[in-house]
Amino acid sequence: YRYRDPILDETTAVLAITQSGETVDTLAAMEEARDKGALLWSIVNAIGSQAMRTADGHITMNAGPEIGVASTKAFTTSIVDQYLLAIYLGQLRGTIDAEQRRQLVRDVARLPALIGDVLDDDARLHELAGELYPYTDFLYLGRGINYPIALEGALKLKEISYIHAEGYPAGEMKHGPIALIDENMPVLAIALQDDLYEK
């Protein structure tokens, strides 16, 4: 981030997202933003961390301690925090009204039950793992806002299972990576029922 010479000034808001609040690269990026006059906020899991103290304001994840390297709870709660922030900013800017805000917040409140339903389908998850475990390379694809989710999915597989995986933008598949795909590489597509679903 710092070496990309970001264009920042006092009209820019920078949101630093960090689980520990102590990662050197994140803190250095925050200092870069501050030096250039940007408004600096953090989404942080570790209460009292340097990122929390350094920022002009903060949103806490409240995910609890991360035991594993994959940082799944912090990633998930940071996404929810960003979504809620976007909802409230949308209402303040007039792009959504109070009723739309309430509905979006209700939708977020349903997430724990929906995630629980997926986790409760242990037999299906076990079956899927049984089908996929022999493979040594995976490709995750996503379009638009789902591309970062594809990257994160590939990262989780690498960190937890020690299996090679890469995330890639679905629209760029035909520009090279498709040449690497064969029957020995499962492809996981993040394809939500949104405007990009038909692609």
Identify the residue ranges that each predicted region occupies.
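Phosphate/diphosphate-binding loops
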Residues: 12-93, 193-199
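Glycine-rich oxoanion-binding loops at beta->alpha junctions
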Residues: 1-17, 23, 164-180
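Short coil/turn segments at beta-strand junctions that form active-site/ligand-binding loops
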Residues: 10-12, 38, 135-136, 185
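Active-site phosphate/pyrophosphate-binding segments
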Residues: 57-188, 196
